[in-house]
Amino acid sequence: AAFRMDLDPAPGDATRVNLPHPEIFAALEPGASLLVNDGKIRLRVDACGPDFADCAVTVGGVISNRKGVNVPDVVLPLAALSKKDRTDLEFACELGIDWLALSFVQRPEDVTEARDLARGRAAILSK
């Protein structure tokens, strides 16, 4: 089945949804995989542009609001840690945790940033 992700803020339906992240569209190429809702839904990009991705559904399902999108085949121009992640990391270290699990690691700098913020108070696990 065909499915579109785009920047159009209109409510989604069975044929398309809004993905409000132009940086993802800018980095996509045909053949890239998109994993939605922790990989429960899988899409393959057939065609794309600066504001859309036309995809083939390889594993279907229902997409509800604010589900995560992972692009495992593409290095995205995004920081590994959001402002909230940095705050949460500091709080976790203050609690005395032993390990921090860093998701969606794309570059060595992502781990370096987390390690610098942890300042030796916790080990980093890349996943």
Segments from the language model and where they lie:
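Non-catalytic helical/linker scaffolds that mediate oligomerization, partner binding
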Residues: A1-K127
